[in-house]
A protein has these predicted regions:
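Amphipathic alpha-helical polymerization modules
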Residues: 1-143
Length: 143
């Protein structure tokens, strides 16, 4: 059986993962027109990769049922899709043919991702509120 604190831990892990996703989306949107980075070349879109970690695998949770998982960000990866080439011969980052490579960030796609992450975060908050209400109700019954 999943206890109150374990349920809160699961929900909190989801909130933390969505916060990382929102931060990467913000970085992508902030760099949508960055044609030169310190590493050289245009900014490359980044994406977090999530993994499920079973609570039964974590130290201190041996009594929990299998199948309950925390969410963790295992890594942040760079999107390998090519950027957009735009003919701008006067641009300082133009190549010999006059083309500038812009980041592989699609602002509309990022906005959709932001809405999805925001809704997932809201769902996590709702689950925490529900767990708190259940714990409160259980305490009231015990009185």
């Amino acid at each position: 059986m999943l206890g109150v604190f374990s349920a809160l831990e699961v929900a909190a892990s989801g909130l933390s993962a969505e916060r990382v996703r929102m931060n990467t989306i913000a970085s992508n949107l902030a760099n949508v027109r960055t044609t030169r980075t310190p590493e050289g070349g245009p900014y490359r879109r980044i994406d977090p990769v999530f993994e499920a970690v079973g609570l039964d695998q974590l130290q201190g949770f041996p009594q929990l049922q299998r199948g309950v998982s925390l969410v963790r960000v295992s890594r942040v990866v760079e999107d390998k899709r090519p950027g957009t080439m735009v003919y701008e011969p006067g641009h300082p980052d133009a190549n010999a043919d006059g083309y500038v490579e812009y980041p592989n960030v699609n602002a509309v796609e990022e906005m959709v991702n932001m809405i999805t992450a925001s809704r997932a975060y809201e769902a996590g908050i709702t689950s925490i509120d529900t767990v708190k209400q259940m714990a409160h109700s259980a305490l009231e019954i015990g009185r």
